[in-house]
Amino acid sequence: MITPNEFPLVEVLPHNGAPALFIDGQPVFPLLLMTGARALEDLKEIAPCAIHLLTDTFPLCWTGIGRYDFNQFDAALENFLKADPQAMIMPRIHLDAPQEWMDAHPDEVVGYADPAAWSGDTSWGGARHPSWASRLWRNAASEALRELVRHVKNSDYASHILGWHLGSGIYGEWHYWNAVYYPDTSPAFVAAYRDWLAQRYPKVMPEPRTPTIEERRAASLGVFRDPANSRWFIDHAEFFHLLGDQALAEYSRVVKQETDGRSLVLAFNGYLPDLDVNREIDHRAFDKTLRNPDVDSFASPHSYTRRAPGDDAPMRGFMGSVRALGKLWFDEADERTSIAHPTQWKHVTTMEESVEVLWRSFAHALTHNCGLWFMDQGGLWFMDRTRGWYQDKAILDAFAAMGRVGAESMQRPRTRVSEVAVVASFKNAFYLADRSSGLDQVTNTLINPQLEQFVKSGAPFDIYLITELFEPTVPPYRVYAFLDTFFLTDDELAKVKALRDAGKTLLFFYAPGFLSENSISLERMRDLLGMDVQMTDSMILPDGKEQRPGFIVPGANGAVAQAGNVFYCPAPPLPAARLRGVLQAGGVHSYLETDDPLMVGGGYIGIHAASDGQKSIHNPVRADWANVRTGETLARHNTKLV
């Protein structure tokens, strides 16, 4: 039992086969609602709201140099508790610096290779913010966060704090500020980079060098940089991406220290790199962030590319990697409903469609043993009381049903049943030309269109970064599909070859293993594939875009070449129909013969129909079938449901 001014104990622990949220020793399905206190009051006028785990953006309360004002934070918390006395709340805190601080420390403010950053464009977070390399900012923001957590710890509402969602960068999502304008050229960055190089190269330190935009767009062979003469660039990219990890590590440590380890820490991080913009926006040190003992959970909005009814709207992270390290993934389900006023990203026109896309988000989280919060941007950002996105009884009834299903799921085995591992690489970006060069047409194809084909393949899959694929907690799979692993360390290459030699079915795309830490090697790629791959000046991808260089396998018939248990698709995407053949060759069970988005895990199967007509689901073992939304029994002791 906690006292009124003591933080509850909120943890992520193993439970029935997967990481789970625990509150004061009890497993809880992590279904949250992100809305404003006033909007929550409005929802209660329609029907009771079954979701009592809440989140919203709260102020850091850092008002000036050495000054803090907690009144706004206190008032916001009290308003939520008036709206829902049972609420447990996770404040989202942006570690922004006040203008006064930046005025006093101009050398600590982000600089940009592209001067257009200062044009007034705020769509990527705006230009004037502290550099993530700034030691002064990290120290001052850490102190501000420490003062805030101490204040909350001594408040009457401490027992209602679920955890702390820590953010910085664009929308608090740990994307570097104004990333499309190529940060960071500030004196703070240059000084920190010099110190880092001195530690890495203690005998002969190279001079710190910041690449120009033209140098970022350059390459040695088509899209590829030759590691032999690009070490300076690779070092810069690696250091740049470490900064967000380092800053988050300091802030998460503050929370754990000041809460005596009782509060959950969550951060946006580890997104699929699916925006097709320059890579400064990505989280390419996620393998290190994932291993931070002070961060319990990670989150992302799900994909914005396929959200219409019938689309898959996939979660936008590497859930396999997160699960392997014992952490918990959250999906930010910011689906626009039919009553939402903004038109951007809005794909539904009726309340029935609205409810179905919300259930689609829930099914993704349920079958992946993840959490989610439904994000009511209308209730957050508009004072007009007619603008809440969830102000309809059908939606509140759906939330209540989801809460019931989620609670029931915590009593069941929470294991994944996937026989396919899909593997990607964050490090390969350091060896590629910037996307704005026009030289890289293939990586976005692999992250967006190719993943869509996997969703349509009739078999569930788990997605990993290669940095976690060989963790001891990762289960064996029948098929391993390597999306963009053009760069492989010698150790990674040896482990992938061991999978091949053990008889696992492997599927590769474009240029697997073509890059090592020291060189470009076609022979290395041939040895991995066991094929006489030939390099050409260029190739045309199925979408009509030209990619340099190209690769072919002489004598191969069609889009995919085969050598025993190894399959190779040089020009992605590989269509779902052909992909099904590869998976079947690897002995993978097919649950669905149609191209509908499929979600399977934890004893649940979800389908979000992409087309009209009859659907047949095939389970590998006999089972009793029920509609969890209605409770209706559909079939007993059967392997098939129509």
Predicted regions and their residues:
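N-terminal carbohydrate-binding accessory modules
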Residues: M1-I46, S409-Q411
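Aromatic-lined substrate-binding rim segments of carbohydrate-active enzymes
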Residues: L40-D121, A140, V149-K153, L248-T259, ...
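Short, acidic/polar
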Residues: T35-A47, V277-R291, S354-F362, L469
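Polysaccharide-binding and catalytic clefts of secreted carbohydrate-active enzymes
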Residues: D103-V295, P301-Y304, D312, F318
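Aromatic-lined carbohydrate-binding/catalytic grooves of carbohydrate-active enzymes
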Residues: P48-A75, P98, Y271-F286, P293-S297, ...
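Hydrophobic faces of well-ordered beta-strands that scaffold small-molecule active sites
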Residues: L31-L33, L53-D56, I89-I93, L162-L166, ...
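Carbohydrate-binding surfaces of carbohydrate-active enzymes
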Residues: P4, A249, Q257, G261-R262, ...
